Amino acid sequence: MRRLAALIVLLVFTSCGSAPPVRTSPPVSDLVIPTTVPNGKVDVVVKATYTVGETIRATIRLSPTTGTLRGPLDPFIQASGFHGTATVRHLAIDPISVGAGSAEVVVLWDMRDDSGTAVGSDDYSLVFNVIDDSGRTTTVGTTLQVR
């Protein structure tokens, strides 16, 4: 009888425990895509994915370790697919020059091509150049996933 009572108490005790916590997906944070250049680093901060019709926002951070960096120069959006790559949009962005520390510039793309037509779901690339005070040019690019 004692064993039965102990078993019942044990079952009641263990069944009153809380349920395991519900697992949720972690929030999607921004991605920082670093590129090393001859005299420092360029970071491009983007979202993991964008929604069709949403204005694309990317932050470009120039961080020279010596000398200066200037950019983004000649920025454009290109589409990549089975048939190769194609320039979708040339962007008008005022470049910045950084001599010490770091500085940022925000890039906005309204998901339209050069003729003003809205574009759809695809993998796009933000491509631009940076130049250092020695005249060395580095091309930087990052993928923008639009779904």
Question: What feature does the model see in each segment?
Answer:
Residues 22-38:
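N-terminal low-complexity, Pro/Thr-rich disordered segments
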Residues 17-19:
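Bacterial signal peptide processing site
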Residues 12-15:
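C-terminal motif of bacterial Sec signal peptides marking the signal peptidase cleavage site
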Residues 123-125:
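Short, conserved beta-strand segments of beta-strand-rich sandwich/propeller modules, principally
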Residues 136-147:
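Short beta-strand elements
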Residues 7-10:
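Classic N-terminal secretory signal peptides
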Residues 1-4:
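Positively charged n-region of N-terminal signal peptides that target proteins for export
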Residues 33-42, 48-113, 117, 127-131:
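Contiguous segments within soluble domain cores/interaction surfaces
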